[in-house]
Amino acid sequence: MFKLRTGYFISGIATGLILLFSFIFSLPDGKLHIHVCDVGQGDAIYVRFPNGKDMVIDGGPNDAIIGCLGKYMPFWDRHIDVVAMTHPQKDHMQGLIAVLKRYKVAYFLRSDVGNSSQGFIDLLDVIRDKRVAVRYITRGEQIRIGKVVISLLWPSDQQVSKGANVQDVYSKGGSQVLGQTTGDLNDYSLVFWLRFGAFDALFTGDADTHVEDNYVGTTLADRTVELLKVPHHGSRTGMNNAFVQWLRPRVAVISVGKNMYGHPSREAINLLQSVGSQIHRTDKEGDIEVVSDGNTWKIE
């Protein structure tokens, strides 16, 4: 009996030590961690800030993001500070429903443009049921999280107003909310510029070249960007030479899976190679992590 109790005691101590070390290693390390999750043909990004706060940008086309969050969030953490949806298309939006159901979310960021898809309706229902605070953001607004500054480059107030007007017209007619094709939603995709010391990252959603023309050359871009989340999964309409020459990204991450669209395109790859970008793809490498201390950075 004594040996049995001793075994339980030792086992309990070992378990306690494992939990303690897991807790210690999950504490904020003062670095920025950006995880581009492998969710197939879609986008889902988890950002853990130097002070321990966190943000999710898009949720991918399914629940795969939950597995990604489980790997990179502390095991005891069921709270996410900010969730942002770049635009309401399934390959960016659907997984956010599972995120909102599983985690307590403080703020939900979006543009004031939607659609009539069942997925978007379900997402709004969960946001309402969970009483998540919603913030509608447009170009020029900033979010400060510790030493990190996130600036919104797109959409502008005028673009959102245009989308709202189209929404009114088409919702009355029983058609799709935003014009005649869901591709129009890409025109309203949130574009975030993140700065942490000397480290810069650009998150582009599905914004294509005719959107990029509205912010290429902005005064926010005063030096080479370290990380580019490549627009629209590497679509041939996602970037042009002016965009790539403006950014000259050190690292370009393409979030992509098996698809029938030819993503990533040869044109996109060639543009990135022309400026010497390191190209990483989730379909070939799985989750991709970029870590920065505000001065240096590395790919994990």
PLM regions: where:
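Non-globular, low-confidence helical/coil segments that flank catalytic cores
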Residues: 1-300
